[in-house]
Amino acid sequence: MASLARAMLALLALYAAAIAAAPSTTTALDTTPNGGGGGNSSEGELSPSPPPTPAPASPEAGAVSTPPVPPPSVSRRKPPRNNNRTRVHGDKATAHGRKRIVCRERLFSARVGDAVSFGCAVFPRAGETFEVRFYRRGRFRSPDADPEYFDEPPRPELPRERLLFSSANASLAHADALAPVVVEGERATVANVSGEVSVRVAAADAETEGVYTWRVLSANGTEVRSANVSLLLYSQPEFGLSAPPVLFGEPFRAVCVVRDYYPRRSVRLRWFADEHPVDAAFVTNSTVADELGRRTRVSVVNVTRADVPGLAAADAADALAPSLRCEAVWYRDSVASQRFSEALRPHVYHPAAVSVRFVEGFAVCDGLCVPPEARLAWSDHAADTVYHLGACAEHPGLLNVRSARPLSDLDGPVDYTCRLEGLPSQLPVFEDTQRYDASPASVSWPVVSSMIVVIAGIGILAIVLVIMATCVYYRQAGP
């Protein structure tokens, strides 16, 4: 029983020690700022107090020693970072949190001809100046595009680098005076309003595309900070294809136009005849540039069936032309492109025969193998009578027609011109001109000449008869 009593007393002593240690640990946690703790606490933090050692039991009670209770775990957090030390667009903040140069945007993409405005806020320190410079560079060139062949050389480019504005002059008039130096016609102007230095381009073109740099300079001219704003331009082209009519036997022709594209050297163009590639030897290319730098490319193909491998030859009865297709790809930049494609089949005409003659007081015009949509007309627009003579035997689908009109009442020579109208303007003119002389001398001379011919004929006949009679007489009178 004595040993059981000693064990009970030991348990009671252990419980009392645990109760005594709990208040001391709670106080240590409450005095730790920001919830921090641990042996590596920052300056001004309090470490938790260790629990007191429990009192041993009296020898009389036979007390047993117990191990100390470990302190509860405490979370550790790093102090908050100083957000004033940041980098925005490469500009390091000052000690008071203000950056030297702050730009709203760093990249502008605009269409050629549009008005563009951009700028940066500049905060120089005492003794510092700032300026704005322009660098003409960074233009996109597609490696897949075709070379450009100019009918006329483009205008000479201005210097690649120019000063637009400098605060050292402390005058906006200075900026306005420098603007025409960069681009002719005062297309770029600079304004400084309360440290916001903005550039306005009235009509963005090839000479205003590039990099605009804001620079902060120290008193000795050394660059302290700089920021760049890039202006990239584009112009989506217009695409068109035309195929003028041709005469049978002539090369087929088509014209493809890619109008007002930009960047320069950003178009690839190919020709196909009935989906067979056309060799570049049968293609003529030319390029022109407008005042804004936009390009217009004109490509002309002249090809026969024999020039394109794979095309079937056409005989005289088959005037069908191949389908001529123009395909162009415009590269706006290194990742974006647009494809254009259109096909046309030129119309083939057979040459018509037009002739004028005079019959019994009428001028008669004959048109052979004429298209149904065409008609015969006189140059003086005189009233006429049209006759349809039937189909053209050589070329089915074509007609033979005739136009007759009375001769003029005017005395003297008169020209009569008959022309085939209603055909496309690209074809040659089919016409014929004959002259009829209605003067009295010209009219009577045929009668006189006829009488002379008759009299001469009678005289010759009489002479022949006399000779024959003489020969017969002498033959009969012979011995």
Swiss-Prot record:
Which biological processes are named by the entry's GO terms? adhesion receptor-mediated virion attachment to host cell; symbiont entry into host cell; symbiont-mediated suppression of host complement activation
In this entry, the parts of the chain located on the Cytoplasmic side of the membrane are 473-479
Positions on the Virion surface side per record topology: 23-451
Main localization is virion
Q: Does the keyword Transmembrane apply?
A: yes
Any one cellular component term from GO for this entry? membrane
Q: Does the keyword Signal apply?
A: yes
Please provide the record's keywords in A-Z order. Disulfide bond, Glycoprotein, Host-virus interaction, Inhibition of host complement factors by virus, Membrane, Signal, Transmembrane, Transmembrane helix, Viral attachment to host adhesion receptor, Viral attachment to host cell, Viral immunoevasion, Virion, Virus entry into host cell
Q: Which cysteines are joined by disulfide bonds?
A: 103-120, 256-326, 365-418, 369-392
Chain positions covered by the region annotation HDB2: 95-101
Biased-composition ranges, Pro residues, are: 48-57
Residues annotated as region HDB3? 135-140
Classification via InterPro entries: GA_GC, Ig-like_dom_sf
* Secretion signal, residue range per the UniProt entry: 1-22
Q: Where in the cell is it found?
A: Virion membrane
Transmembrane feature ranges: 452-472
| Record's function text | Essential for the initial attachment to heparan sulfate moieties of the host cell surface proteoglycans. Plays also a role in host immune evasion by inhibiting the host complement cascade activation.
Subunit comment: Interacts with host complement component C3; this interaction inhibits host immune response by disregulating complement cascade.
> Which family is this sequence assigned to?
Belongs to the herpesviridae glycoprotein C family.
What is the protein's given name? Envelope glycoprotein C homolog
